[in-house]
Amino acid sequence: MEEEELDKSALKYFEHGAVELEKFWKRFGGKPNLNASFLDVGCGHGALCIDLAKSGAKKVIGVDIEPERIKFARNNLNINYPELKNIVDFHAVDLAYYNNSEQFDYIVSKDSFEHIIDLPAMIEEMKKRLKPGGLVYAGFGPLYRDFYGDHKRTNSIIPWGHLFRSDENIIKKLNRKNDVNISSIYDLGLNKLSLVEYKEIFEKSGLETVFFKLNNSNHPILKFFNLLAKFPFLTEYFAHNIYCILRKKCVDD
């Protein structure tokens, strides 16, 4: 198949994502054992998959529901990383429809959990594809109740502005201004989950939470947020990101 020229905006997004990966892994305390198999859920343009393969992973599969992103990831792999073609593969598919007989040592997910509408169902699908003792590395944010938790998709001008308006008002104005037809905030790719709800989902998932950190960053603003988040009535509104590691229990645990 003839390779297409890479879209410049997508390539720029990929390159930015690659630069951010050092911070991503640092927030977990470093990369996991790389002589292993990995599944990247919500792989986007494939930066994390390429990083894992370059670092020594035995096998890396990236899945994403956006066909254009997967198209870019495949072309980028063929053009710029041909030496990794036997290690990395990309699939434009919902995880629920990906081969559930294959299990991985690790599942990774970067900046995706806040966009997954039915997160409990997604975690259940992850469990099926995780080896006993395997780990899920997930880092994501901003959370919906954060100052820009709407990912600037609601056209709110001020911080926390999306929380001061009803969903109905937001939807009505977006439909009128952008000539679209959405019926809920979910249509913007935002699950609206709170910090408490994320914790409950992880607790009920059947996976063991072995690492959990809120506002995991050295940025001065997030350090300040951490101080404010210590006050129970402010916690939800200053919960910017979550970095967690979830473990699938072994039979003899």
Protein language model features and the residues they cover:
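Conserved N-terminal segment of class I S-adenosyl-L-methionine
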Residues: M1-E102, Y106, K110, H219-P220, ...
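Conserved phosphate-coordination/catalytic loops
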Residues: E15-V19, I117, K192
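Short glycine-/acidic-enriched loop or helix-start segments at secondary-structure transitions
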Residues: I50, F72, D118-L119, F147-G149
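A structural alpha-helix within SAM-dependent methyltransferase catalytic domains
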Residues: I50-A53, I123-K127
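A generic structural signal for alpha->beta connector loops
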Residues: A57, K85-I87, G133, G206-T209
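Short catalytic micro-motifs in class I SAM-dependent methyltransferases
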Residues: D111-H115
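Helix-to-beta-strand junctions that scaffold the AdoMet/dcAdoMet cofactor pocket
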Residues: I116-I117, L130-K131
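S-adenosyl-L-methionine-dependent methyltransferase catalytic module, highlighting the catalytic core
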Residues: P120-E125, L135-C244
